[in-house]
Amino acid sequence: MTQTFIPGKDAALEDSIARFQQKLLDLGFDIEEASWLNPVPHVWSVHIRDKACALCFTNGKGATKKAALASALGEYFERLSTNYFFADFWLGDTIANGPFVHYPNEKWFPLTEDDEVPEGLLDARLRAFYDPDDQLTAGMLVDLQSGNDERGVCGLPFTRQSDGETVYIPMNIVGNLYVSNGMSAGNTPNEARVQGLSEVFERHIKNRIIAESISLPEIPAEVMARYPGVVESIAKLEAEGFPIFAYDGSLGGKYPVICVVLFNPANGTCFASFGAHPDFGVALERTVTELLQGRSLKDLDVFTPPTFDDEEVAEHANLETHFIDSSGLISWDMFKQDADYPFVDWSFSGTTEEEFATLMAIFKAEDKEVYIADYEHLGVYACRIIVPGMSDIYPAEDLWLANNSMGAHLRDTILSLPGSEWEKEDYLALIEQMDDEGLDDFTRVRELLGLATGKDNGWYTLRIGELKAMLALAGGDLEQALIWTEWTMEFNASIFSPERANYYRCLQTLLLLSQEEDRQPLQYLNAFLRMYGTDAVEAASAALSGEASFYGLQAVDSDLQAFPAHQSLLKAYEKLQRAKAAFWAK
């Protein structure tokens, strides 16, 4: 078998692919290559997923088909090892009360009456960073996955790189502020760590360049000529009508970052891709492959025009959009003729061990502490790297303003609504409670509660505003029900099934009629039946009477048996739990 070695990797691509695929089979995961893209020469991307659980998927990119597949499989192990596939979901009562929720080496810190953040969690530096004004409480730090107040706060062990000490960081903080940033898997610990640290630089410097509207120096043609594959990819994009700028994003040779920008003159928009690696050529190639990961040439019309409004560009919401799908705003200043920094033909490359030391030295020079959690329980090395003040995707204030576990205390109540027989005032009191707690009307209930509902039921599209319409109906407040029904039709109509949209049109009509005291409802019944159909008229009438107000929502038990999608997710998690238990028992 031929062996292909590429810079930055400590094993041949063929060996990595064979090893990763075999390990996945051994763990019980049946992975399929769902789609491939090769829009220009030397740019490949692939989407792989678990046949039994479509929520477990990754994308890979590379200059060759093999490199893209190895990339996707590596990312799959990264997300399995760090539990990232399950980061947005409640794992149910059984796992929440099992021997361990995340890893056997986790540590639980019980909640106390004063709700102070428990001793033994975080170090002094982290406490000062996450909670400078003493606003954090222990209750805010219960993790979404367990939602188990009785067990307390779950801390995961990280190694502080400056002195090798173990520091316990709440899973809640890891999940809320860092999401997928700084996670990596690889053939060796150094290879994976270099990748994870490079990603931290990439995102941090990208945010700085965008937020500060920095104008970057172009990479000279003679430097680009060292990388003929990249030159050919760019030439093809330009031939298709997309001007390309390749920039040195190192800010004067300090950071191993490259930026490539694509213009789309057909609609006046642009898109900036960033990549980082100690090896200049690897960083450049990554940036170009990232530009087109999961995109064909006809998918390049979804970005935004450049702007002169630098304040809007610097807003945190814009930077979050760039993290999610790179479709945020960019300042025209990035493209100024006179760059803010000179071009540097930088190189931080060496063996992966040397590269790790080089990158760590940059963090040390900036007085940034690095915390690393190592994971080897799946037979492939993976890690999660946290650099407070550099790798955070969301600000620390989100822990009290937008915590992913802020709806956990409502979970049992909301899930029990479809079969409930409460007093009318209790339904209306729940609307008041949601208002008092400041829940956003646009929030999807499944995301608030951490549910994988599948797309075939009303829970999938249910937002807080629509839930308020249902509660108002159940509480007999028809005026409020009409307000929230019309809100629902305005904001959710585009994602409703035809049946659900028709039901809401019918419900709105019946609610409007209920306000007309001098009209006789039966006079209109035949017309309604012909307009909306018997099923919708009966369902809307039952909602109006308070007899069945929760249209399309099935009752759900505490282990979420009602949602096959959630059950497939839990089955995947059980495979991981078995592997963890076996590894830590050694």
Predicted features by range, described:
Residues 1-586:
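Helix-biased "structured C-terminal domain" signature
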